[in-house]
Amino acid sequence: MDSEFFQPVYPRHYGECLSPVSTPSFFSTHMYTILIAIVVLVIIIIVLIYLFSSRKKKAAAAIEEEDIQFINPYQDQQWVEVTPQPGTSKPAGATTASVGKPVTGRPATNRPVTDRPATNNPVTDRLVMATGGPAAASAAASAAASAAASAPAHPAEPYTTVTTQNTASQTMSAIENLRQRSTYTHKDLENSL
């Protein structure tokens, strides 16, 4: 047997046929998937930024609105000297405050007992007290009687504040009415002073 019959026959470009086929890159095969994912991420980021900015605007508006509304006047008000009005009882442990100290133990109500109906409007309370309406006369009489009977000697104006020149009874009744409400406006504060 001749060995030349068993020689393999190679095609001309056999080396080129055996070279590995170049596989496409990851980006070229998944190009559309990657682009869609990037677009979705950008949309999500834009939506989140919009939501957080609107929340910040709402929070800023709420804080600004809270700055306009006044809190309980007793929280920040500094009184020169506080003594209970005639006709009210001092609770146990209540002390008189001095300058620089907030009022801590105040009576449940600063208004003397009267026969007039209680109103929550500081404007009408102030008008009734200023004009000396029928309820104001009986209130003055009952206050004088109870002051002579049970109260020790007090200064002429027991409720003097650092910031106002109004009489004590007008200021305290208006502030007491404001204290019973939850929100206040500039007009309410002006009416109480």
Swiss-Prot record:
Residues 159-171 are annotated as: Interaction with host DYNLL1. It is a single-pass membrane protein. Sequence repeats lie at residues 135-138, 139-142, 143-146, 147-150. It holds the Pfam family ASFV_J13L. Belongs to the asfivirus envelope protein p54 family. Interacts with the host light chain cytoplasmic dynein DYNLL1; this interaction is critical for intracellular microtubule-dependent virus transport toward viral factories. Inner envelope protein involved, through its interaction with host dynein, in the intracellular microtubule-dependent transport of viral capsid toward viral factories. Seems to induce caspase-3 activation and apoptosis. Plays a role in virion morphogenesis by recruiting and transforming the host ER membranes into the precursors of the viral envelope. Involved in virus attachment to the host cell. This is Inner membrane protein p54. It comes from African swine fever virus (isolate Warthog/Namibia/Wart80/1980) (ASFV).
